[in-house]
Amino acid sequence: MLGRCFPPDTKEKQQLRMTKLCDPAESELSPFLITLILAVLLAEYLIGIIANGFIMAIHAAEWVQNKAVSTSGRILVFLSVSRIALQSLMMLEITISSTSLSFYSEDAVYYAFKISFIFLNFCSLWFAAWLSFFYFVKIANFSYPLFLKLRWRITGLIPWLLWLSVFISFSHSMFCINICTVYCNNSFPIHSSNSTKKTYLSEINVVGLAFFFNLGIVTPLIMFILTATLLILSLKRHTLHMGSNATGSNDPSMEAHMGAIKAISYFLILYIFNAVALFIYLSNMFDINSLWNNLCQIIMAAYPAGHSILPIQDNPGLRRAWKRLQLRLHLYPKEWTL
């Protein structure tokens, strides 16, 4: 959807966009399957908003109460805020495009959604990459001088890196929209012999456009893969060393290391799937209403939800806070009945 350009005339642009969004000829899906996809997407959005909201609330409360927060907590606050905003935006976009297509097809509304979508996705990718980078620097066991110096300075660098990521994501999202706008405005119409039909050059140099749209995905993706892989290898090596010296099979330290390896592996898989789905979605390899395009949307919605549930399960503090919240919610109706 983001990669498609439209002719310069506003009314014709809106008409073409509305036709493209709801053209039944492009739809391969039955009404039942469309309803099912919408239900799955809405469930994923709600789960993601609740899970990320919980993580943000816990660390924000710690930040306010103690006037300070851990570096990992700071990253998680930034990451949770970006994901809540992204999930809310996607849910709002589906609602508006389904109920008021004419309003959604207006230039200001349409491009506002697209700029926000790109910006929040890139922010989420960058923040998750910095979280992986921070864990790698703090946990991995390497003795290189540069690595040890980075470990000493990483706490002070993270706040600057987070705000730099926001600036890079915003600049890139604006750049992507400007590229598409300039490209569309320079796609001159070709008149037919009777001057009643116009053919617009709307998909020239698709590879170049896809490159510009997806440039912001590659760097955080590579950084996340490298740091997560190196951290897994470091933990695996340390676990094997502990196993050779362990006296019992139920060593709590070894179980903690194995749990960390599994959690990071899940993070890595989710991150890669999300980045690939986002790449395909922005590149418009498939029709808007096709099953593959909807599958990309489901994966992109599942990533913030799944990636947020795992820290709640693996982090002892978050797990305890979640159990306390469940207990309060369970007791709350009983207090009203007394």
From Swiss-Prot:
Pfam families in the cross-refs: TAS2R (PF05296)
Membrane topology: Multi-pass membrane protein
GO biological process: detection of chemical stimulus involved in sensory perception of bitter taste
Location(s), subcellular: Membrane
Swiss-Prot/TrEMBL keywords: G-protein coupled receptor, Glycoprotein, Membrane, Receptor, Sensory transduction, Taste, Transducer, Transmembrane, Transmembrane helix
Transmembrane segments: 31-51, 75-95, 117-137, 157-177, 206-226, 263-283, 292-312
UniProt topological domain (Extracellular) ranges: 1-30, 96-116, 178-205, 284-291
Disulphide bridges, residue numbers: none
Gene Ontology annotations for the cellular component aspect, listed alphabetically: membrane; plasma membrane
Chief location: membrane
GO molecular function, one term: G protein-coupled receptor activity
Entries under PANTHER family matching the protein: TASTE RECEPTOR TYPE 2, TASTE RECEPTOR TYPE 2 MEMBER 39
Miscellaneous comment text of the record: Most taste cells may be activated by a limited number of bitter compounds; individual taste cells can discriminate among bitter stimuli.
Entry function: Receptor that may play a role in the perception of bitterness and is gustducin-linked. May play a role in sensing the chemical composition of the gastrointestinal content. The activity of this receptor may stimulate alpha gustducin, mediate PLC-beta-2 activation and lead to the gating of TRPM5.
Protein name: Taste receptor type 2 member 39
Gene: TAS2R39
